[in-house]
């Protein structure tokens, strides 16, 4: 192996490690906001609302929402790119499982009995974890959550790279 190949392989492994770390941070952050029920990322809040409407688990609801967005993404780009679809699903599956697991774990701590001020701080910490994790995994640039891919598609295919407008459209 040449030095260049070794560097590329090392970089690839490091990027996957950062993706794994970001999945853990992201899942804990989302689980904190779900348990606190004081505010969350908009897509997670929507999934939690659906979870309360039907008999599916939170994990199944999050995964189902991810699959729906994967289909929407394929429609928006007018083609099926299997690498992109598989990447979105590879992100969504552990993401859904981990949020369900961490939510159950956090609920058992009795954290919801804390005073409101402390719960607000915990909820804000959860939102900050989500922001940090999203930044990490997007920099790893391996696979995306379907909702983040959706925003990127809107931004670059339809809004000439304007991130601000893409974020607003993404939430509609």
Where are these regions (language model features)?
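Core subunits and conserved enzymes of cellular information-processing
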Residues: 2-172
């Amino acid at each position: 192996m040449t030095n260049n190949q070794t560097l590329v392989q090392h970089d690839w492994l490091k990027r996957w490690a950062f993706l794994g770390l970001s999945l853990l941070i992201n899942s804990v952050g989302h689980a904190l906001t779900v348990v606190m029920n004081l505010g969350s990322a908009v897509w997670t809040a929507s999934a939690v609302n659906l979870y309360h409407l039907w008999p599916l688990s939170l994990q199944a609801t999050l995964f189902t929402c991810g699959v729906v967005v994967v289909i929407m993404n394929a429609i928006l780009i007018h083609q099926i790119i299997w690498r992109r679809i598989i990447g979105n699903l590879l992100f969504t599956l552990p993401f859904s499982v981990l949020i369900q697991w961490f939510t159950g774990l956090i609920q058992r701590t009795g954290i919801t009995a804390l005073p409101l001020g402390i719960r607000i701080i915990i909820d804000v910490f959860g939102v900050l974890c989500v922001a940090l994790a999203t930044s990490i995994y997007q920099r790893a640039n391996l696979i995306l959550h379907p909702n983040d891919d959706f925003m990127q598609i809107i931004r670059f295919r339809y809004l000439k790279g304007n991130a601000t407008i893409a974020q607003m459209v993404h939430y509609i």
